[in-house]
Protein backbone atom coordinates (compact mmCIF):
# COMPACT_ATOMS: atom_id res chain seq x y z
CA UNK A 1 0.00 0.00 0.00
CA UNK A 2 1.03 3.63 -0.35
CA UNK A 3 2.26 5.43 2.73
CA UNK A 4 4.12 8.62 3.51
CA UNK A 5 7.82 8.90 4.25
CA UNK A 6 9.71 11.98 5.35
CA UNK A 7 12.34 13.52 3.12
CA UNK A 8 15.95 12.54 3.70
CA UNK A 9 18.78 15.08 3.51
CA UNK A 10 19.68 13.62 0.11
CA UNK A 11 16.15 14.33 -1.08
CA UNK A 12 16.40 17.94 0.05
CA UNK A 13 19.55 18.44 -2.00
CA UNK A 14 18.03 16.90 -5.11
CA UNK A 15 17.24 19.62 -7.62
CA UNK A 16 13.81 19.69 -9.21
CA UNK A 17 12.73 21.97 -12.06
CA UNK A 18 10.63 24.39 -10.02
CA UNK A 19 10.90 27.61 -12.03
CA UNK A 20 8.65 26.31 -14.81
CA UNK A 21 6.09 25.22 -12.19
CA UNK A 22 6.18 28.70 -10.65
CA UNK A 23 5.63 30.22 -14.10
CA UNK A 24 2.65 27.92 -14.63
CA UNK A 25 1.09 28.99 -11.34
CA UNK A 26 1.49 32.69 -12.18
CA UNK A 27 0.08 32.20 -15.69
CA UNK A 28 -2.85 30.20 -14.34
CA UNK A 29 -3.85 32.95 -11.92
CA UNK A 30 -3.49 35.64 -14.58
CA UNK A 31 -5.61 33.79 -17.13
CA UNK A 32 -8.08 32.74 -14.45
CA UNK A 33 -8.84 36.32 -13.44
CA UNK A 34 -8.96 37.44 -17.09
CA UNK A 35 -11.29 34.60 -18.10
CA UNK A 36 -13.62 35.11 -15.13
CA UNK A 37 -13.76 38.85 -15.80
CA UNK A 38 -14.86 38.19 -19.38
CA UNK A 39 -17.42 35.74 -18.00
CA UNK A 40 -18.88 38.41 -15.73
CA UNK A 41 -19.00 40.85 -18.66
CA UNK A 42 -20.95 38.48 -20.90
CA UNK A 43 -23.26 37.57 -17.99
CA UNK A 44 -24.00 41.29 -17.65
CA UNK A 45 -24.51 41.52 -21.42
CA UNK A 46 -27.23 38.88 -21.16
CA UNK A 47 -28.78 40.66 -18.17
CA UNK A 48 -28.49 44.21 -19.53
CA UNK A 49 -27.93 44.00 -23.32
CA UNK A 50 -27.29 47.74 -23.73
CA UNK A 51 -24.71 47.91 -20.95
CA UNK A 52 -21.81 46.72 -23.11
CA UNK A 53 -23.29 47.43 -26.53
CA UNK A 54 -20.74 49.03 -28.84
CA UNK A 55 -21.91 48.55 -32.45
CA UNK A 56 -18.66 49.93 -33.85
CA UNK A 57 -16.53 47.49 -31.83
CA UNK A 58 -17.29 44.03 -33.17
CA UNK A 59 -14.91 42.32 -30.75
CA UNK A 60 -17.14 43.32 -27.80
CA UNK A 61 -19.98 41.19 -29.19
CA UNK A 62 -21.33 38.36 -27.05
CA UNK A 63 -20.63 36.01 -29.97
CA UNK A 64 -16.91 36.78 -29.81
CA UNK A 65 -16.58 37.24 -26.07
CA UNK A 66 -18.24 33.95 -25.15
CA UNK A 67 -15.61 31.64 -26.78
CA UNK A 68 -12.94 33.95 -25.34
CA UNK A 69 -14.38 33.31 -21.87
CA UNK A 70 -14.67 29.53 -22.28
CA UNK A 71 -11.19 29.15 -23.75
CA UNK A 72 -9.64 31.44 -21.14
CA UNK A 73 -11.07 29.58 -18.16
CA UNK A 74 -10.80 26.05 -19.59
CA UNK A 75 -7.64 26.07 -21.66
CA UNK A 76 -5.71 29.09 -20.35
CA UNK A 77 -6.48 28.77 -16.63
CA UNK A 78 -7.17 25.03 -16.51
CA UNK A 79 -4.40 24.13 -18.95
CA UNK A 80 -1.74 26.06 -17.04
CA UNK A 81 -2.91 24.50 -13.77
CA UNK A 82 -2.60 21.04 -15.30
CA UNK A 83 0.83 21.70 -16.81
CA UNK A 84 2.16 23.20 -13.57
CA UNK A 85 0.76 20.52 -11.25
CA UNK A 86 1.70 17.63 -13.56
CA UNK A 87 5.29 18.89 -13.76
CA UNK A 88 5.39 19.21 -9.97
CA UNK A 89 3.72 15.88 -9.18
CA UNK A 90 5.64 13.75 -11.67
CA UNK A 91 8.96 15.00 -10.30
CA UNK A 92 8.07 14.37 -6.66
CA UNK A 93 6.45 10.98 -7.15
CA UNK A 94 9.26 9.78 -9.44
CA UNK A 95 12.06 11.49 -7.47
CA UNK A 96 13.47 12.67 -10.79
CA UNK A 97 14.03 16.02 -12.47
CA UNK A 98 11.91 16.81 -15.53
CA UNK A 99 13.28 15.10 -18.61
CA UNK A 100 14.39 17.17 -21.58
CA UNK A 101 16.06 20.14 -19.91
CA UNK A 102 14.56 23.28 -21.45
CA UNK A 103 11.82 21.30 -23.20
CA UNK A 104 9.52 22.01 -20.25
CA UNK A 105 9.95 25.74 -20.89
CA UNK A 106 9.06 25.19 -24.55
CA UNK A 107 5.87 23.52 -23.35
CA UNK A 108 5.02 26.43 -21.05
CA UNK A 109 5.76 29.25 -23.48
CA UNK A 110 4.45 27.34 -26.48
CA UNK A 111 1.16 26.62 -24.75
CA UNK A 112 0.65 30.23 -23.73
CA UNK A 113 1.49 31.40 -27.25
CA UNK A 114 -1.29 29.07 -28.41
CA UNK A 115 -3.66 30.77 -25.96
CA UNK A 116 -2.76 34.17 -27.44
CA UNK A 117 -3.17 32.90 -31.01
CA UNK A 118 -6.58 31.47 -30.20
CA UNK A 119 -7.85 34.41 -28.14
CA UNK A 120 -6.81 37.11 -30.60
CA UNK A 121 -8.40 35.05 -33.36
CA UNK A 122 -11.76 34.99 -31.56
CA UNK A 123 -11.77 38.75 -31.12
CA UNK A 124 -11.19 39.43 -34.83
CA UNK A 125 -13.69 36.77 -35.89
CA UNK A 126 -11.25 34.01 -36.87
CA UNK A 127 -12.85 30.80 -35.60
CA UNK A 128 -13.86 27.33 -36.76
CA UNK A 129 -17.16 27.71 -34.90
CA UNK A 130 -16.72 24.35 -33.15
CA UNK A 131 -17.42 24.50 -29.43
CA UNK A 132 -14.24 24.14 -27.34
CA UNK A 133 -12.34 23.73 -30.64
CA UNK A 134 -12.69 27.22 -32.07
CA UNK A 135 -9.00 27.94 -32.90
CA UNK A 136 -8.22 27.86 -36.61
CA UNK A 137 -5.77 25.55 -38.36
CA UNK A 138 -2.59 27.54 -37.73
CA UNK A 139 -3.17 27.56 -33.96
CA UNK A 140 -4.12 23.87 -34.04
CA UNK A 141 -0.84 22.91 -35.73
CA UNK A 142 1.15 24.92 -33.20
CA UNK A 143 -0.69 23.26 -30.29
CA UNK A 144 0.05 19.82 -31.77
CA UNK A 145 3.79 20.55 -31.71
CA UNK A 146 3.61 21.84 -28.14
CA UNK A 147 1.53 18.87 -26.99
CA UNK A 148 4.02 16.36 -28.40
CA UNK A 149 6.75 18.13 -26.40
CA UNK A 150 4.52 17.93 -23.30
CA UNK A 151 4.00 14.19 -23.79
CA UNK A 152 7.72 13.58 -24.31
CA UNK A 153 8.61 15.57 -21.18
CA UNK A 154 6.12 13.65 -19.05
CA UNK A 155 6.99 10.21 -20.44
CA UNK A 156 10.72 10.92 -20.22
CA UNK A 157 10.39 11.82 -16.55
CA UNK A 158 8.44 8.63 -15.86
CA UNK A 159 11.10 6.64 -17.72
CA UNK A 160 13.97 7.99 -15.59
CA UNK A 161 12.08 7.66 -12.30
CA UNK A 162 13.82 6.40 -9.16
CA UNK A 163 10.60 5.11 -7.64
CA UNK A 164 9.70 1.61 -8.89
CA UNK A 165 5.95 2.31 -8.87
CA UNK A 166 4.08 4.87 -10.97
CA UNK A 167 1.79 6.69 -8.55
CA UNK A 168 -1.92 6.85 -9.43
CA UNK A 169 -1.95 10.62 -10.04
CA UNK A 170 0.47 10.09 -12.92
CA UNK A 171 -1.90 7.58 -14.54
CA UNK A 172 -4.59 10.23 -14.75
CA UNK A 173 -2.19 12.90 -16.00
CA UNK A 174 -0.88 10.56 -18.71
CA UNK A 175 -4.41 9.56 -19.76
CA UNK A 176 -5.31 13.25 -20.05
CA UNK A 177 -2.25 14.06 -22.18
CA UNK A 178 -2.59 11.09 -24.55
CA UNK A 179 -6.37 11.26 -25.02
CA UNK A 180 -6.45 15.02 -25.60
CA UNK A 181 -3.79 14.52 -28.29
CA UNK A 182 -5.99 11.98 -30.12
CA UNK A 183 -9.13 14.11 -29.76
CA UNK A 184 -7.34 17.23 -30.98
CA UNK A 185 -5.87 15.54 -34.04
CA UNK A 186 -9.10 13.90 -35.23
CA UNK A 187 -11.56 16.71 -34.52
CA UNK A 188 -9.36 19.37 -36.13
CA UNK A 189 -8.74 17.58 -39.42
CA UNK A 190 -9.41 20.37 -41.89
CA UNK A 191 -8.29 21.91 -45.15
CA UNK A 192 -7.17 25.56 -45.20
CA UNK A 193 -8.55 27.69 -48.00
CA UNK A 194 -4.95 28.79 -48.51
CA UNK A 195 -1.81 28.66 -46.42
CA UNK A 196 -1.88 32.46 -46.57
CA UNK A 197 -5.42 32.63 -45.15
CA UNK A 198 -6.81 31.84 -41.73
CA UNK A 199 -10.00 30.09 -42.89
CA UNK A 200 -10.27 26.31 -43.11
CA UNK A 201 -13.03 23.75 -43.67
CA UNK A 202 -13.51 20.51 -41.76
CA UNK A 203 -12.95 17.20 -43.54
CA UNK A 204 -16.22 16.00 -41.99
CA UNK A 205 -19.71 17.16 -42.91
CA UNK A 206 -23.29 16.76 -41.82
CA UNK A 207 -24.10 14.39 -39.00
CA UNK A 208 -20.57 12.91 -39.11
CA UNK A 209 -19.19 16.37 -38.38
CA UNK A 210 -21.60 16.81 -35.46
CA UNK A 211 -20.73 13.40 -34.01
CA UNK A 212 -16.98 14.01 -34.35
CA UNK A 213 -17.35 17.41 -32.69
CA UNK A 214 -19.24 16.06 -29.68
CA UNK A 215 -17.01 13.01 -29.41
CA UNK A 216 -14.31 15.65 -28.98
CA UNK A 217 -16.41 18.08 -26.91
CA UNK A 218 -17.61 15.54 -24.37
CA UNK A 219 -14.20 13.93 -23.99
CA UNK A 220 -12.49 17.30 -23.66
CA UNK A 221 -14.64 17.55 -20.54
CA UNK A 222 -13.90 13.91 -19.69
CA UNK A 223 -10.13 13.98 -20.03
CA UNK A 224 -9.13 17.65 -19.82
CA UNK A 225 -11.53 18.75 -17.09
CA UNK A 226 -11.93 15.40 -15.33
CA UNK A 227 -9.00 12.99 -15.73
CA UNK A 228 -6.36 15.72 -15.49
CA UNK A 229 -7.88 17.25 -12.38
CA UNK A 230 -8.36 13.83 -10.81
CA UNK A 231 -4.58 13.62 -10.96
CA UNK A 232 -4.56 16.76 -8.81
CA UNK A 233 -7.08 15.21 -6.41
CA UNK A 234 -5.10 12.00 -5.97
CA UNK A 235 -1.94 13.90 -5.08
CA UNK A 236 -2.94 17.04 -3.22
CA UNK A 237 -5.72 15.70 -0.97
CA UNK A 238 -3.57 12.91 0.51
CA UNK A 239 -0.67 15.34 0.76
CA UNK A 240 -2.67 18.04 2.53
CA UNK A 241 -4.52 15.60 4.80
CA UNK A 242 -1.31 13.67 5.52
CA UNK A 243 -3.18 10.43 4.87
CA UNK A 244 -2.65 7.72 2.24
CA UNK A 245 -5.19 7.28 -0.53
CA UNK A 246 -8.20 5.50 0.99
CA UNK A 247 -8.20 2.57 -1.45
CA UNK A 248 -5.54 2.04 -4.06
CA UNK A 249 -7.59 -0.81 -5.54
CA UNK A 250 -10.56 1.53 -5.94
CA UNK A 251 -8.33 4.04 -7.73
CA UNK A 252 -7.40 1.31 -10.24
CA UNK A 253 -11.09 0.54 -10.87
CA UNK A 254 -11.83 4.27 -11.09
CA UNK A 255 -9.07 4.82 -13.64
CA UNK A 256 -9.75 1.97 -16.06
CA UNK A 257 -13.52 2.43 -15.90
CA UNK A 258 -13.18 6.08 -16.91
CA UNK A 259 -10.77 5.17 -19.70
CA UNK A 260 -13.07 2.57 -21.26
CA UNK A 261 -16.47 4.20 -20.64
CA UNK A 262 -16.03 7.97 -20.98
CA UNK A 263 -14.96 7.88 -24.62
CA UNK A 264 -18.34 6.41 -25.71
CA UNK A 265 -20.63 8.94 -24.03
CA UNK A 266 -20.37 11.85 -26.51
CA UNK A 267 -23.62 11.14 -28.44
CA UNK A 268 -25.69 12.21 -25.41
CA UNK A 269 -25.05 15.78 -26.60
CA UNK A 270 -26.98 14.99 -29.79
CA UNK A 271 -30.18 13.41 -28.49
CA UNK A 272 -33.26 14.16 -30.61
CA UNK A 273 -31.13 15.13 -33.62
CA UNK A 274 -30.34 13.50 -36.98
CA UNK A 275 -27.87 11.17 -35.29
CA UNK A 276 -28.95 7.51 -35.71
CA UNK A 277 -31.12 6.23 -32.88
CA UNK A 278 -28.69 3.43 -31.98
CA UNK A 279 -25.87 5.95 -31.53
CA UNK A 280 -28.03 8.15 -29.30
CA UNK A 281 -28.99 5.14 -27.17
CA UNK A 282 -25.35 4.03 -26.97
CA UNK A 283 -24.32 7.47 -25.71
CA UNK A 284 -27.12 7.49 -23.12
CA UNK A 285 -26.28 3.97 -21.90
CA UNK A 286 -22.58 4.61 -21.42
CA UNK A 287 -23.35 7.93 -19.72
CA UNK A 288 -25.51 6.18 -17.12
CA UNK A 289 -22.85 3.50 -16.58
CA UNK A 290 -20.30 6.29 -16.08
CA UNK A 291 -22.04 7.38 -12.89
CA UNK A 292 -20.74 4.39 -10.91
CA UNK A 293 -16.95 4.73 -11.46
CA UNK A 294 -17.23 8.50 -11.08
CA UNK A 295 -18.76 8.11 -7.64
CA UNK A 296 -16.15 5.48 -6.84
CA UNK A 297 -13.53 8.17 -7.39
CA UNK A 298 -15.50 10.66 -5.31
CA UNK A 299 -15.76 8.18 -2.43
CA UNK A 300 -12.04 7.47 -2.69
CA UNK A 301 -11.24 11.18 -2.49
CA UNK A 302 -13.57 11.87 0.45
CA UNK A 303 -12.65 8.76 2.44
CA UNK A 304 -8.97 9.65 2.18
CA UNK A 305 -9.80 12.02 5.05
CA UNK A 306 -10.68 9.11 7.34
CA UNK A 307 -9.16 9.99 10.69
CA UNK A 308 -8.49 13.57 9.61
CA UNK A 309 -11.98 15.08 9.32
CA UNK A 310 -11.19 17.48 12.16
CA UNK A 311 -8.71 19.24 9.87
CA UNK A 312 -11.61 20.64 7.84
CA UNK A 313 -12.38 23.02 10.72
CA UNK A 314 -8.89 24.49 10.83
CA UNK A 315 -7.57 24.10 7.27
CA UNK A 316 -9.60 26.07 4.69
CA UNK A 317 -7.34 24.87 1.86
CA UNK A 318 -8.13 21.23 2.62
CA UNK A 319 -11.81 22.17 2.95
CA UNK A 320 -11.70 23.69 -0.54
CA UNK A 321 -10.13 20.52 -1.95
CA UNK A 322 -12.74 18.32 -0.27
CA UNK A 323 -15.67 20.48 -1.36
CA UNK A 324 -14.34 20.24 -4.92
CA UNK A 325 -14.72 16.45 -4.70
CA UNK A 326 -18.31 16.90 -3.48
CA UNK A 327 -19.02 19.07 -6.53
CA UNK A 328 -17.39 16.39 -8.69
CA UNK A 329 -19.83 13.87 -7.27
CA UNK A 330 -22.79 16.18 -7.83
CA UNK A 331 -21.82 16.99 -11.42
CA UNK A 332 -21.16 13.34 -12.28
CA UNK A 333 -24.60 12.38 -10.98
CA UNK A 334 -26.40 15.21 -12.75
CA UNK A 335 -24.64 14.57 -16.09
CA UNK A 336 -25.79 10.94 -16.46
CA UNK A 337 -29.28 11.94 -15.27
CA UNK A 338 -29.47 14.63 -17.97
CA UNK A 339 -28.38 12.09 -20.61
CA UNK A 340 -31.58 10.07 -20.07
CA UNK A 341 -33.81 10.88 -23.02
CA UNK A 342 -36.89 11.73 -20.96
CA UNK A 343 -34.88 14.21 -18.87
CA UNK A 344 -32.95 15.52 -21.85
CA UNK A 345 -36.21 16.34 -23.63
CA UNK A 346 -36.71 19.01 -20.97
CA UNK A 347 -33.12 20.09 -20.31
CA UNK A 348 -31.62 20.25 -23.80
CA UNK A 349 -30.79 23.75 -25.10
CA UNK A 350 -31.86 25.31 -21.79
CA UNK A 351 -30.00 27.12 -19.03
CA UNK A 352 -30.18 23.94 -16.96
CA UNK A 353 -27.22 22.74 -19.03
CA UNK A 354 -25.39 26.00 -18.26
CA UNK A 355 -25.97 25.41 -14.54
CA UNK A 356 -24.73 21.83 -14.81
CA UNK A 357 -21.57 22.85 -16.64
CA UNK A 358 -20.75 25.54 -14.11
CA UNK A 359 -21.34 23.33 -11.08
CA UNK A 360 -18.52 21.21 -12.46
CA UNK A 361 -16.40 24.09 -13.73
CA UNK A 362 -16.64 26.41 -10.71
CA UNK A 363 -17.08 23.80 -8.00
CA UNK A 364 -14.93 20.89 -9.16
CA UNK A 365 -12.30 22.36 -11.51
CA UNK A 366 -12.11 25.75 -9.82
CA UNK A 367 -11.88 24.56 -6.23
CA UNK A 368 -9.44 21.70 -6.84
CA UNK A 369 -7.25 24.13 -8.82
CA UNK A 370 -7.38 26.77 -6.10
CA UNK A 371 -6.58 24.18 -3.45
CA UNK A 372 -3.59 22.91 -5.42
CA UNK A 373 -2.27 26.44 -5.99
CA UNK A 374 -2.69 27.30 -2.29
CA UNK A 375 -0.50 24.25 -1.60
CA UNK A 376 2.05 24.94 -4.33
CA UNK A 377 2.83 28.59 -3.63
CA UNK A 378 4.16 28.02 -0.08
CA UNK A 379 6.01 24.87 -1.19
CA UNK A 380 7.64 26.51 -4.20
CA UNK A 381 8.46 29.90 -2.71
CA UNK A 382 9.30 28.38 0.71
CA UNK A 383 7.07 30.85 2.54
CA UNK A 384 4.11 30.38 4.82
CA UNK A 385 0.74 31.35 3.40
CA UNK A 386 0.11 35.00 4.24
CA UNK A 387 -3.39 34.61 5.68
CA UNK A 388 -5.68 31.66 6.34
CA UNK A 389 -8.44 34.16 7.11
CA UNK A 390 -8.28 35.38 3.51
CA UNK A 391 -8.61 31.78 2.33
CA UNK A 392 -11.78 31.60 4.43
CA UNK A 393 -13.07 34.75 2.74
CA UNK A 394 -12.21 33.31 -0.65
CA UNK A 395 -13.97 30.05 0.14
CA UNK A 396 -17.21 31.57 1.37
CA UNK A 397 -17.41 34.29 -1.29
CA UNK A 398 -16.87 31.72 -4.02
CA UNK A 399 -19.24 29.18 -2.49
CA UNK A 400 -22.00 31.78 -2.27
CA UNK A 401 -21.26 32.73 -5.87
CA UNK A 402 -21.51 29.11 -7.03
CA UNK A 403 -24.79 28.56 -5.19
CA UNK A 404 -26.34 31.70 -6.69
CA UNK A 405 -25.06 30.80 -10.14
CA UNK A 406 -26.12 27.18 -10.40
CA UNK A 407 -29.45 27.47 -8.56
CA UNK A 408 -30.52 30.43 -10.72
CA UNK A 409 -29.63 28.50 -13.87
CA UNK A 410 -31.37 25.35 -12.66
CA UNK A 411 -34.59 27.26 -11.97
CA UNK A 412 -34.30 29.28 -15.18
CA UNK A 413 -33.53 26.20 -17.26
CA UNK A 414 -36.39 24.06 -15.97
CA UNK A 415 -38.79 26.99 -16.37
CA UNK A 416 -37.44 27.58 -19.88
CA UNK A 417 -37.96 23.95 -20.90
CA UNK A 418 -41.49 23.86 -19.49
CA UNK A 419 -42.46 27.13 -21.20
CA UNK A 420 -41.13 25.93 -24.56
CA UNK A 421 -43.28 22.81 -24.49
CA UNK A 422 -46.47 24.38 -23.09
CA UNK A 423 -49.51 24.28 -25.41
CA UNK A 424 -52.90 25.95 -25.14
CA UNK A 425 -56.28 24.30 -25.72
CA UNK A 426 -55.99 24.95 -29.47
CA UNK A 427 -52.68 23.14 -29.82
CA UNK A 428 -50.61 26.29 -30.27
CA UNK A 429 -47.54 27.21 -28.25
CA UNK A 430 -48.57 28.92 -25.02
CA UNK A 431 -45.63 31.34 -24.88
CA UNK A 432 -43.87 33.42 -27.50
CA UNK A 433 -40.09 33.17 -27.61
CA UNK A 434 -39.83 36.75 -26.33
CA UNK A 435 -41.93 35.85 -23.28
CA UNK A 436 -39.56 33.00 -22.42
CA UNK A 437 -36.57 35.33 -22.72
CA UNK A 438 -38.28 37.95 -20.54
CA UNK A 439 -39.00 35.34 -17.86
CA UNK A 440 -35.28 34.51 -17.68
CA UNK A 441 -34.23 38.08 -16.87
CA UNK A 442 -34.25 37.95 -13.02
CA UNK A 443 -32.24 34.74 -13.07
CA UNK A 444 -29.68 36.22 -15.45
CA UNK A 445 -29.13 39.02 -12.94
CA UNK A 446 -28.66 36.49 -10.11
CA UNK A 447 -26.25 34.53 -12.31
CA UNK A 448 -24.20 37.67 -12.98
CA UNK A 449 -24.10 38.39 -9.23
CA UNK A 450 -22.92 34.84 -8.57
CA UNK A 451 -20.16 35.18 -11.14
CA UNK A 452 -19.12 38.52 -9.64
CA UNK A 453 -18.82 36.95 -6.17
CA UNK A 454 -16.75 34.09 -7.58
CA UNK A 455 -14.45 36.57 -9.31
CA UNK A 456 -14.23 38.55 -6.06
CA UNK A 457 -13.10 35.45 -4.21
CA UNK A 458 -10.44 34.80 -6.83
CA UNK A 459 -9.13 38.36 -6.48
CA UNK A 460 -8.86 37.80 -2.71
CA UNK A 461 -6.79 34.71 -3.53
CA UNK A 462 -4.51 36.67 -5.87
CA UNK A 463 -3.89 39.25 -3.13
CA UNK A 464 -3.18 36.51 -0.58
CA UNK A 465 -0.70 34.76 -2.88
CA UNK A 466 0.97 38.06 -3.80
CA UNK A 467 1.51 38.88 -0.12
CA UNK A 468 2.78 35.34 0.47
CA UNK A 469 5.40 35.58 -2.26
CA UNK A 470 6.47 39.14 -1.47
CA UNK A 471 6.40 39.21 2.30
CA UNK A 472 5.40 35.86 3.73
CA UNK A 473 7.25 34.29 6.62
CA UNK A 474 10.05 32.04 5.39
CA UNK A 475 9.37 28.36 6.08
CA UNK A 476 12.08 26.33 7.83
CA UNK A 477 13.57 23.62 5.66
CA UNK A 478 12.25 20.89 7.94
CA UNK A 479 8.66 21.81 7.12
CA UNK A 480 8.95 20.91 3.45
CA UNK A 481 6.09 18.74 2.26
CA UNK A 482 6.67 14.99 2.51
CA UNK A 483 7.09 12.89 -0.60
CA UNK A 484 4.85 9.98 -1.47
CA UNK A 485 6.76 6.73 -1.32
CA UNK A 486 5.93 3.10 -1.97
CA UNK A 487 6.61 1.19 1.20
CA UNK A 488 5.37 -2.30 0.53
CA UNK A 489 2.75 -3.76 -1.74
CA UNK A 490 0.12 -5.89 -0.12
Give the role of each language-model region.
Residues 2-6, 15, 311:
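Long amphipathic alpha-helical scaffold segments
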Residues 2-4, 22-126, 137-158, 170-195, ...:
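Hydrophobic cores of alpha-helical transmembrane segments in multi-pass integral membrane proteins
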Residues 9-23:
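Cytosolic juxtamembrane amphipathic/interface segments immediately preceding
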Residues 128-131, 273-276, 345-348:
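Membrane-interface helix termini and inter-helical loops of multi-pass transporters
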Residues 135, 197-205:
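Surface-exposed loop and adjacent secondary-structure segments within mature catalytic domains
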Residues 203-212, 347, 352-354:
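Active-site-proximal inter-transmembrane loops
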Residues 473-490:
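Short, highly charged, low-complexity non-transmembrane loops/tails of multi-pass membrane proteins
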Amino acid sequence: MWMYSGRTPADEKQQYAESVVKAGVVAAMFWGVAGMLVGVIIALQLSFPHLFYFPDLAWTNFGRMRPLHTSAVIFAFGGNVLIATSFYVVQRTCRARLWGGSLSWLVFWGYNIFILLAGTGYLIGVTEGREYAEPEWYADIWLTIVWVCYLLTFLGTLWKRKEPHIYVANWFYLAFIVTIAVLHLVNNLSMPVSFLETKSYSLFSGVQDALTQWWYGHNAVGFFLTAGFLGIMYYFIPKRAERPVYSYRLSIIHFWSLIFIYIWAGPHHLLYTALPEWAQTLGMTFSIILWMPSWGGMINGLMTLSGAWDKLRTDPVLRMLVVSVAFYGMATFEGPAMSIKAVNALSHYTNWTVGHVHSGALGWVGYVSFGAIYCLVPWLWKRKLYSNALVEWHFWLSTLGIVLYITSMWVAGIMQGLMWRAYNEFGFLEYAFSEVVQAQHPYYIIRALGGLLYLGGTLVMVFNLWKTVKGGEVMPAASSAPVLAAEAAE
